[in-house]
Amino acid sequence: MTENSVAKEIVDVAYRIHTVLGPGLFESVYEAVLASELQKRGLQLARQQPIPVVCEGTRFEMGFRADLVVEDKVIVEIKSIAEIAALHKKQLLTYLRLADKRLGLLINFNVVLIKDGISRIVNGLQE
């Protein structure tokens, strides 16, 4: 599967979850349900996957934890907050660079319309 086809599956499941559960739950609930539904579709994923950081030649095993890494291609960062800030998008871009991945999805479930809560972040594009 390509990054785009994986992302399409993730977005489709996110829409379904938001329709059924609505906004206002803890991030951990959305993460668990999203992971379960993606696995039902046959997608491989890791939850709370530690991603190491290398800084000036020193490797730190616990740089950060990715909420979900799907098919070893797409990092999903899940939020349930009032508003996504530019910092959240930059944070996901940093995760993508450190994990050497090209595509990330920032999904905020605490919105009226889920389409307003999904941001696609691509590593490697000029800003």
Regions found by a protein language model. Name each.
Residues M1-V20:
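Interdomain/boundary linker segments immediately adjacent to catalytic/signaling cores
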Residues A7, V11, L34, K89-L92:
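Alpha-helical structural signal
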Residues F26, E31-K73, I81-A82, V112-L125:
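Active-site metal-binding core of divalent-cation-utilizing nuclease and nuclease-like domains
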Residues K79-E127:
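Nucleic-acid nuclease catalytic cores
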